[in-house]
Amino acid sequence: MTSNRMQTGHPADGVYFGLMSGTSMDGVDGIAVRFEAGKPPAVLSEAFVGFADTLRDALFALQQPGDDEIEREALAANALAARYAVCCHELLRTAGLSPDDVRALGVHGQTVRHRPERGYTRQLNNAALLAELTRIDVIADFRSRDVAAGGQGAPLVPAFHATVFGSPDETRVVCNLGGISNITILPAGGGPQGEGHARNDTVRGHDCGPANALIDAWVERHLKQPFDDGGRFAARGKVDETLLAALLDEPYFRQNAPKSTGRDLFNADWLDAKLAGFQHLAPENVQATLTALTAATVADEIARHAGDCRAVYVCGGGARNPVLLDALATALAARGLDAAVATTAALGVPPQQVESLAFAWLAYRFNARAPGNVSTVTGAAGERVLGALYPR
């Protein structure tokens, strides 16, 4: 096989892998994609590799301070790298590629701490081991440079969203419903820029609040299921408006952008504290209310920052929850917004591919020595090349 590395029109063109393991911590999504200047990304294959319960438990435990953290973190990072490598080998197999055909692998890692106000963010991974196991250049640690430049380090996907989802005719919002919800606002006048030169001066975005982090935690506690399949648990319940008001009484929701958040704030302890005095509620009513919380906080931010938007395109795990999507549409209408809600599949990108595609694209940007952040989104002092290289 002739190496793809010799068949490029731009020095950074070629095949890239992207790996993303989100706050659900259920596994890693991987994608193989070809980037060529002036052309849209071409997906070659995708894969999902789940995490064993032991690894998932270790990752959840590292969300909170505890004993012997350095040892536990190192062992969990090694286990993560091993699962990431399995995903990469599956991508190689299904795409018919060899490691020499891949320019680089962009890997997010697993966030275990995100505290930009203290000047750091920590995405767990052993990138050196991953490079050894795959024999592919690994580009990792994308968030730290933005934080070092005074930014939030999140969200990092808006520049990619602008590249593939922008429109010359309408203002669009891309909403990621992962563990945490975030929005990217793409004003009319943009448009897909195949080589990735997003109009960063007009793009805005930030984290809104909790999404699947709390929804999944509650359904796992009561049904021993990893997520609310189809939103059925929430559909059995009724929103409790008093509890919803208590949940919304959180300073983060009143904070101005740029802002970012994570499980450091929105976790089971936060929820349990808010539920004090609501022990009489049936679990399905709490689930319905958590779903309404996600819809309300996203709709509030869209109404505040993108009142002229006509379409909201959803990606992330929440895109597979029709009850949540209906709640979002209802919440937008209640705030006077005439905005249709659809998934990014309507724009040609399946919602489960968006995040892993974004980190493959960030690896592409690193190789091009081009900025990957949007400083107006993160609050960084300027645009920066993101990531660190671990050669094969």
UniProtKB/Swiss-Prot annotation:
Under InterPro entries, the record lists: Anhydro_N_Ac-Mur_kinase (IPR005338), ATPase_NBD (IPR043129)
EC no. given is: 2.7.1.170
What are the UniProt keywords, alphabetically? Answer: ATP-binding, Carbohydrate metabolism, Kinase, Nucleotide-binding, Transferase
According to the UniProt entry, the coiled-coil residues are: none
GO terms (BP aspect): 1,6-anhydro-N-acetyl-beta-muramic acid catabolic process; amino sugar metabolic process; peptidoglycan turnover
Q: Where does ATP bind?
A: 22-29
Molecular function via GO:
ATP binding; kinase activity; phosphotransferase activity, alcohol group as acceptor
Q: What does this protein do?
A: Catalyzes the specific phosphorylation of 1,6-anhydro-N-acetylmuramic acid (anhMurNAc) with the simultaneous cleavage of the 1,6-anhydro ring, generating MurNAc-6-P. Is required for the utilization of anhMurNAc either imported from the medium or derived from its own cell wall murein, and thus plays a role in cell wall recycling.
PANTHER family membership? ANHYDRO-N-ACETYLMURAMIC ACID KINASE (PTHR30605:SF0)
- Name of the protein this chain belongs to: Anhydro-N-acetylmuramic acid kinase
Q: What is the organism of origin for this protein?
A: Burkholderia pseudomallei (strain 1106a)
